[in-house]
Amino acid sequence: MQENLVIVESPAKAKTIEKFLGEDYKVMSSYGHIRDLKKKELSIDPKTLEPDYEIPDEKKKLVSELKSNAKKAKKIWLASDEDREGEAISWHLCEVLGLDEAKTNRIVFHEITKSAILDAIKSPRHLNMDLVNAQQARRVLDRLVGFKLSPVLWRKVKPALSAGRVQSVAVRLIVEREREIQAFHSEPYYRINALFGITNADGSQSEVKAELDTRFKTHEEAVAFLEQCKDAKFAVSNITKKPLRRTPAPPFTTSTLQQEAARKLGFTVSQTMMVAQRLYESGRITYMRTDSVNLSSLAINTSKDEIIKLWGKEYSKTRNYHTHAKGAQEAHEAIRPTFMSQTEIDGTAQEKRLYELIWKRTAASQMADALIDKTTVTIDIAGSQAKFIANGEVVTFDGFLKVYRESTDEDDNNQEEATHMLPVMQVGNVLERREITSTERFSMGPIRYTEASLVHKLEELGIGRPSTYAPTISTIQQREYVQKGDKKGEERTYTVDTLKGTKVTSRERKEMVGSEKGKLLPTDIGIVVNDFLMANFPDIMDYNFTAKVEQQFDQIAEGKEEWNTMMKVFDKSFEPTVDKVMNARSEHKAGERQLGKEPETGKPVFVKIGRFGPVVQIGSADDTEKPRFSQLPSDKSIETITLEEALELFKLPRTIGEFEGSDVVIGAGRFGPYVMHDKKYVSLPKGTDPMKVTLEEAIQLIGEKREQEQKRHIKAFNEDAKLEVLNGRYGPYIAYDGKNYRMPKALHEKAAELSYAECMEIVNNAPEPKGRKRK
């Protein structure tokens, strides 16, 4: 009989831990949850609201192996993660394996190091059923909402849609932000900057840059001010010097890591969590799902030693951080390296970059303040109440800035100029006017969410927890309620007026504004579903309700509330609302909007969500003639399309001529307008009006597409037309019968020389696609 069986969540973790514990311990993995609610049923008792769990088919063999090994072990250690999900995994293991509590130990650790694992073995505890119940409450509530709301969407909006408690609120945030942007009207204003000269004590000249403390609303006011400055004198009236301290940001929580990795490394939220999971399981960092900023005394002391070794005592400052997040869970530490002495690691490029970010943030949190001298100089203008202000900063001690500087979402949108070092000045110094410039600027509207800023907003509102941010953001994109995309900028003209000498000159300049990359944009279906849920289920969509639910989960986790009581109270009001909405009659489906009538026939023109997405429809089902439909191009929105734009879609497809014996046709599909020739399609460039494309322009696009295809095509085979060697983003690959096959790198250079037999050997020996395994 084996002495000890340790069960962890993931196989990677199992391998690492087995090395630490020795021969008396066998370590196995549960690969995440071993049972769950049934997939195709509510799986919840309608009266008691008790969940009905099942072991999925793909887990039955594993469960059998775990049972067999559990029977052989004298003692069992459940070592799933120390959060609500991890506690629930351990409880399910107890239930399914029929474990005896007397010989079952629950152990937890925040890092996978030998000392942490051995310490956990020395201090086991029992299962915490309050944490289990909090997880069950979340799982059951989310199943009730999703399972009961989704059929309502199928009937009232479109088949195959789904709703979720947190995901729907996340979509609401994105839809509302988009509408704020559409409603915003930018207002112009005029900023005045000056360049002055001053003679130094040694006779040399220095420049002083300053900005007027007043901004003008009109061009006329700005020019009038420049005219006023022609004969004015400029003198220093006040100088203030102020020492500033900048303190470092605390160590990473889950959400701040996701935000900084997005800003600094360009990682998606899911990518960050996937890489962090690997770093944790390989013993490089502490547990990555946490809302705590605390550091252990060991981490603080080892950080101090490393900082002193690398930069000296003056750079070290011990700091203790305390968590202020609403409902911060359990006693986790912040995310930090397990060994601060390990400044670099082996691993993938992504692992190295994320580890470096975590290491720097942790080190900076234990470093001295940055010391800065800030000087503000006020410059009077003779004959005017307005004043110029010159700001200068000098970093006298860089402190934590030597290692790390925190980013913000506004970094890319900051229009203000950086501060400068200033020459020595005294009150009464007269400055020489060299140039004063008025620049037309425009008020900044709201900016769209990135994945990182959405995480920040969800956390700010108390919606979700560290374990839910990444899945929520992935889900709303997978379900196509939201898409990550770029917004093309627009060219804008602005005026610049400059006073130099005695002359004011005016000129126009152009700039690109409004271009955005990697922002979260609501789709038409996302907008329609959001509006339907807001109209019919306002409580579910309310930010305060969602945050209150999270607080109730916290109360359950602390043993202050019964989980099934919470479920019954919720379902008592939710179920009647679902029935009422499901049975309500309506002439139109949600999202349907009448734009007007077709002038020639008088038939109504609608825009709505069709089976395959947004469509424009002319006529109704009751008419003698069948309605006509046109897919809405991706650059048009169901909310903003006009009657004129909708009618234009029905002028397509149109034949514009002939090329090489085949018609050249301009059409429009779901992904925008296109050219069709000889059964091949070429997308029109963004912004191109399909009604104005000439035959010559279409032929040029066809030629460019052919060139691209020639570069992509390496080899074809007479033996089988379905087999090709193609050039892709990552080099040559084989395409056969609609599937792609990876080519060994050793063959890349001679891809064009491969025989039919060699290619088919690669196809026939290709590994089966791996199914996704749970953690």
Regions found by a protein language model. Name each.
Residues 51-56, 264, 461-462:
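Flexible beta-alpha connector loops of hexameric P-loop NTPases
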Residues 112-196, 241-245:
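C-terminal or mid-to-C-terminal helical accessory/interaction module adjacent to the motor/catalytic core
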